[in-house]
Design a protein with these regions (language model features):
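Active-site cores of enzymes that catalyze phosphoryl transfer or operate on phosphate-rich substrates
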Residues: 1-12
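Well-ordered alpha-helical segments embedded in enzymatic catalytic cores
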Residues: 11-15, 38
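PLD/PLD-like phosphodiesterase catalytic module centered on the HKD motif
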Residues: 20-26, 33-192
Length: 192
């Protein structure tokens, strides 16, 4: 299924909201920008329901050759980490970790959403033209095996490459930056 803008938003929220511990659902997310508040709330609720959530985020320290201050991902990660949600940072060295992947799976079924959309209001609420693909099927299908292998190898730094670092490497508990992020997300005065 091809999804654009608001349809991506709706599908992502449905994916997260439908994940449950009784089905032994796992939710793996790799994302360049994460800032949209309803998605953050849904992730918190999924974690509290016992869904096994893992996230790989860009540390937002570099963008297009310029240094950044970590907003929004470090502030969002601080919120989610406080609930015990496992987070790793892409180990970037001037480049960006530009993946945008959400994979929900259990032993029987899987769902994959990937494409151009960051999880931000700008990307999901009809401000940018975005296109994602959504695939639903049996968990054993090759597309889900490939997506899972990509996430697991990035998470675990396998294949002889250091791809991610622990949350503590870029943790930022600054209240000033947190409230700056919240203002930027609310007002739209941001590049994310």
């Amino acid at each position: 299924q091809v999804l654009t803008e608001q349809a991506v938003y709706d599908a992502v929220l449905t994916m997260i909201d439908s994940a449950n511990a009784q089905s032994n659902d796992h939710l793996d997310i790799a994302m360049f920008y994460l800032s949209e508040r309803k998605i953050i709330a849904a992730l918190k609720q999924a974690q509290q329901r016992g869904v096994k959530v893992r996230m790989i985020l860009d540390p937002n320290k570099d963008a297009f050759g310029r240094q950044k201050n970590g907003i929004p991902n470090r502030q969002v990660a601080s919120e989610l980490n406080a609930l015990g949600l496992p987070i790793r940072w892409c180990d970037t060295h001037g480049e960006q970790c530009h993946s945008k992947l959400l994979l929900k799976y259990n032993a029987q079924q899987a769902e994959l959403i990937l494409g151009s959309s960051n999880l931000t209001a700008r990307n999901l609420k009809n401000y940018n033209l975005e296109t994602n693909m959504r695939v639903i099927g049996k968990a054993q299908a090759q597309v889900f095996a490939d997506a899972g292998q990509y996430f697991d190898s990035t998470w675990g730094n396998t294949q002889g490459r250091q791809m991610t670092v622990a949350y503590a490497q870029y943790a930022d508990e600054s209240k000033a930056k947190y409230w700056l992020y919240r203002f930027m997300e609310w007002s739209g005065l941001s590049t994310f």
